[in-house]
Amino acid sequence: MTALRIIFLGTAELSCASLQALAGNPQFQIAAVVTQPDRPKGRDLKPQPSPVKSLALRLGLPVLQPERARDEKFIAGLRALQPDLIIVVAYGQILPPAILDLPRHGCLNIHPSLLPKYRGAAPIQWAVANGDTETGVTIMKMDAGLDTGPIVSQRRTPIRPEDDSATLHDRLAQLGAELLVQTIPDHVAGKIQPVPQPAKGASHAAKIKKEDGRIDWNQPAQTIWNRLRAFTPWPGAFTFLSKAMEGTASSVPSFAKSQGSDEALPSKMIKIWKAEVIEEVSGRDSALRRPDAAARRPHLGQKPGEILSADKTGIVVGCGQNALRILELQREGGRRLTAAEFLAGHSIKVGESFLV
């Protein structure tokens, strides 16, 4: 049987598992790998290859890096390769009709959500941030829209309490690769009839911005915890020390200013790596059981951002509903620490507050 000629388009780490799976399968021949041009990264801003380019070179595959996928010479080069199928996984550019119509079996895309939910740039993060308990991968036949093509196959996976965006990303990447290898033969043989995406349930997963990671202590603890998991490792869930806790003030990015105020906040940012939701006061939260605490806080977390207790078990912070126990955190310019390690070197007192 003649191997299927495939052109693979991908850039991000999410793409690598699929490229590896295709390259290691004798049913498929990778005619070319298309990825984004090398981009400046790191402190020295030296051009760095994409994860897909690095993998393709290790596999001995030809690599193309057009600045624009719409470039006519680039498209002519793809046409000359006579692909049977194009596979797209997190490539990063919208493909013109001239590419979509090029292979005889069309273009298949792997999207890390259960389409039509979470079309767009950041489906993994927003599924976690919104507290979803299930997500998955979708293989669709691409059309001119943004993640709107008919569904060829899907596979589901639970979002576990211990998941963050990094662990879920890796699981979905592997799940997508496995599903792709299983789907391609049936798709090419005409055994699968792609199903149009339903209009009901469609949503958009916007690109993550740095400011999305800032903690709003007015939100319920569960919401903050979900967002913490969603925005780990980037941009991270972060907050700022109050003036009383920091002692000095200086300018910070515009997105970090208090709502309704132009006053610059202290520059020392605290990144929270690990936390847990507290719904009831336990015996170990002794500071919460003081008589004055009951008088000041009729229910747990009445004052958002307030330090309710701080000991070796964690730093408990009041939220709009319930509270959050911080277990691991990192001060700007410092290293990641447990709460006990952090408190050994920083003075944080009950009654003080993080900035809301």
What is the meaning of each model-derived region?
Residues 218-244, 258-284, 288-289, 295-356:
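An anion-binding loop in the catalytic cleft
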Residues 1-44:
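N-terminal Rossmann-like dinucleotide-binding module
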Residues 25, 102, 231:
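Acidic-histidine catalytic/liganding microenvironments
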Residues 10, 33, 56, 86, ...:
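A residue-level signal for conserved active-site and pocket-lining positions in enzyme catalytic cores
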Residues 39-59:
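N-terminal beta-loop-helix "entrance" segment that forms/cooperates
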Residues 5-7, 31-33, 58, 62-81, ...:
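Internal alpha/beta domain cores that form substrate/cofactor-binding pockets in large enzymes
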Residues 85-211:
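Donor/substrate-binding cores of folate-linked one-carbon enzymes
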